[in-house]
């Protein structure tokens, strides 16, 4: 009671006395009245009912305090959640690039990442191939040997050999472990060679040419062992499926073809574009669910081996400014993606299987959500036409080297988040998180 003033004590006693009187507690009333030397309760006294009011106020205040404490706890939880780093989503390129690599004296035509080293190879119309440390942003060497524009470059699955092709009608093999010595020059095409790819076994090469053919080469001997014919015009590109069973090609005849690699037969002709088909690529198996959702297809039966087989779906890009997604087995066009303002030059499926990236002569990269076909992101990538685009490779869970595009492994490989683009502006840009 020491904390109360005399006036407060008097008001408290009178309030208690009024409460005891109203409650009929006569003995307690008489004792308090005697001890506190108070007169009888006056019904008009403002102390009448005061104790009940105070008690009710305390209960209301306690409830308010509890509500405020709960609200404060919720706000603190929200604050803590906001302060925690967000779970990393799929890597998508965003400006600015990590490096802009400049040394070529003519447009960059194609790019390839080494499967194990932090090395990027760039092919150019200046007739050279340049090798870059993409992490440091430094140029390591320039390779000369072709006499005309170098149109494409690729590394074998283990990185021991590099292949190039050129408008000089030849392909060349370079030994990466021996100062990039040119160990073989392959002759056979009758016109510019526009595309070269190692098959997954690393023992064969496939090339596409303006002579309207696709050729298969034995790496060990350098001999042409197969020639695929069928296109009516320049074959721009020929790309194998992840298991090497199929090839998809793009041509000036406005078609794309699916080839059986073992027989050289055309299994399907994809018609629908209204101009030159510049690029074609198979979808990786992990993109199949999103593509089926986009096309409104039912999930496959559990025993349907097609659901996990490489080469089921493909994408093509054309000078008609569109991208088409295809069922490669039936030849049906599942969806046409529209958004670019100029030729489509390169297509890459995102390693997550959720997106498709496209590069165009409108100087941009576009990111397409495969599940709904919408463009979710546009990146102003270069000051001139974007001619090429490629992902870094991936190290498999078993330690083997697997390419990011077309991964059909049941064990998720360790992804390397790096994308490179090349341009008519003579630069290469490296995009990392």
Curated annotation (Swiss-Prot):
Residues 8-40 form the LisH domain. WD repeats lie at residues 103-144, 146-184, 188-227, 230-269, 272-336, 339-378, 381-429. The gene is PAC1. Positively regulates the activity of the minus-end directed microtubule motor protein dynein. Plays a central role in positioning the mitotic spindle at the bud neck during cell division. Targets cytoplasmic dynein to microtubule plus ends, thereby promoting dynein-mediated microtubule sliding along the bud cortex and consequently the movement of the mitotic spindle to the bud neck. It comes from the Eukaryota. It is found in: Cytoplasm, Cytoskeleton; Cytoplasm, Cytoskeleton, Spindle pole. InterPro entries: Dynein_regulator_LIS1, G-protein_beta_WD-40_rep, LIS1_N, LisH, PAC1-like_LisH-like_dom, WD40/YVTN_repeat-like_dom_sf, WD40_repeat_CS, WD40_repeat_dom_sf. Self-associates. Interacts with NDL1 and dynein. Gene3D superfamilies: 1.20.960.30, YVTN repeat-like/Quinoprotein amine dehydrogenase. GO terms for cellular component: cytoplasmic microtubule; kinetochore; microtubule associated complex; nuclear envelope; spindle pole. PROSITE patterns: LISH (PS50896), WD_REPEATS_1 (PS00678), WD_REPEATS_2 (PS50082), WD_REPEATS_REGION (PS50294). One of its GO terms (molecular function) is dynein complex binding. Its main location: cytoplasm. Keywords: Cell cycle, Cell division, Coiled coil, Cytoplasm, Cytoskeleton, Microtubule, Mitosis, Repeat, Transport, WD repeat. Residues 57-84 form a coiled coil. GO terms for biological process: cell division; establishment of mitotic spindle orientation; microtubule organizing center organization; microtubule sliding; nuclear migration; vesicle transport along microtubule. This is Nuclear distribution protein PAC1. Belongs to the WD repeat LIS1/nudF family. It holds the Pfam family LisH_PAC1. Dimerization mediated by the LisH domain may be required to activate dynein.
């Amino acid at each position: 009671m020491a904390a109360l003033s005399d006036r407060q004590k008097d008001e408290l006693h009178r309030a208690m006395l009024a409460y005891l009187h109203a409650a009929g507690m006569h003995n307690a009333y008489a004792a308090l009245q005697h001890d506190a030397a108070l007169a009888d309760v006056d019904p008009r006294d403002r102390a009448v009912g005061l104790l009940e009011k105070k008690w009710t106020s305390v209960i209301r205040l306690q409830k308010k305090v509890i509500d405020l404490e709960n609200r404060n706890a919720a706000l603190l939880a929200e604050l803590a959640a906001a302060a925690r780093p967000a779970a990393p989503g799929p890597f998508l390129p965003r400006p600015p690039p990590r490096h802009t690599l400049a040394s070529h004296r003519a447009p960059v035509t194609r790019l390839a990442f080494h499967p194990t080293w932090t090395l990027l190879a760039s092919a150019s119309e200046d007739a050279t191939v340049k090798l870059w440390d993409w992490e440091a942003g430094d140029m390591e060497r320039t390779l000369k040997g072709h006499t005309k524009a170098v149109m494409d470059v690729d590394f074998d699955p283990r990185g021991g050999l590099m292949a190039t092709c050129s408008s000089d009608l030849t392909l060349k093999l370079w030994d990466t472990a021996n100062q990039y010595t040119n160990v073989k020059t392959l002759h056979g095409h009758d016109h510019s060679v526009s595309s070269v790819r190692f098959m997954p076994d690393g023992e064969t090469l496939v090339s596409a040419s303006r002579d309207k053919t696709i050729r298969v080469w034995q790496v060990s001997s350098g001999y042409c062992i197969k020639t695929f014919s069928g296109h009516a015009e320049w074959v721009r590109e020929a790309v194998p499926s992840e298991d090497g069973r199929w090839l998809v090609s793009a041509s000036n005849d406005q078609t794309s073809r699916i080839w059986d690699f073992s027989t050289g037969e055309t299994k399907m002709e994809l018609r629908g574009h209204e101009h030159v088909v510049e690029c074609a690529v198979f979808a990786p198996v992990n993109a199949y669910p999103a593509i089926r959702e986009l096309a409104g297809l039912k999930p496959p039966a559990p025993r349907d081996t097609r659901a996990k087989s490489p080469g089921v779906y493909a994408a093509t890009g054309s000078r008609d400014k569109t991208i088409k997604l295809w069922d490669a087995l039936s030849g049906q066009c599942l969806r046409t993606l529209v958004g670019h303002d100029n030729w489509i030059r390169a297509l890459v499926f995102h390693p997550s299987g959720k997106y498709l990236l496209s590069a165009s002569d409108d100087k941009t990269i576009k990111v397409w959500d495969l599940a709904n076909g919408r463009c979710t992101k546009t990146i102003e990538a270069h000051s001139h036409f974007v001619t090429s685009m490629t992902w870094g490779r991936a190290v498999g869970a078993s330690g083997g080297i697997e390419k990011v595009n077309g991964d059909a492994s049941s064990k998720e490989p360790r992804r390397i988040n790096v994308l490179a683009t090349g341009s008519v502006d003579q630069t290469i840009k490296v995009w990392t998180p």
